[in-house]
Amino acid sequence: MDYSKFFSTELEKLKKEGLYRNFREIDRPIKKFPKADEMQGEEERDVEVWCSNDYLNMSQHPEVINETVKTLLEIGSGSGGTRNISGTSSYHTALEKKLAEVHNKDNALIFASAYTANQSTLWTLGKKIKNLEIFSDELNHASLI
């Protein structure tokens, strides 16, 4: 099989169907919210971003930035691994404990994204519950459809 030709053809199909993903380069300078800089080739243009997960612009709040810098200086960057090997820190555990407490639950588990949370949940339920049927419609999050 000519894999190069096969995958080139598949990529072209995605492009023709409008399903090929092009990632937009967007930089969000501090004190510019909700405006941002979008790079299109060599050109930069101002855009407004209302689709990020940083709804309240907390990532640019001075206290959040200061605490982030403080934590980076204490423990460095990155978890060192996935959660199931060496990537669970006391910070993860403390956050999960606080989330469980706030929501009056026994435990909580944080995920890197809503997508991974949804995928993990559906996969686990489907594997553990015999004959489970999952119904979804176009109003659900894209990761559930």
Task: Please give the residue ranges for each predicted region.
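N-terminal "arm"/small-domain region of PLP-dependent enzymes with the aminotransferase-like
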Residues: 2, 13-75
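Short coil/turn connectors at secondary-structure junctions
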Residues: 44, 104-106, 129-132
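Conserved N-terminal alpha-helix of the aminotransferase class I/II PLP-enzyme fold
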Residues: 66-113
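Conserved PLP-anchoring active-site segment centered on the Schiff-base-forming lysine
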Residues: 121-142
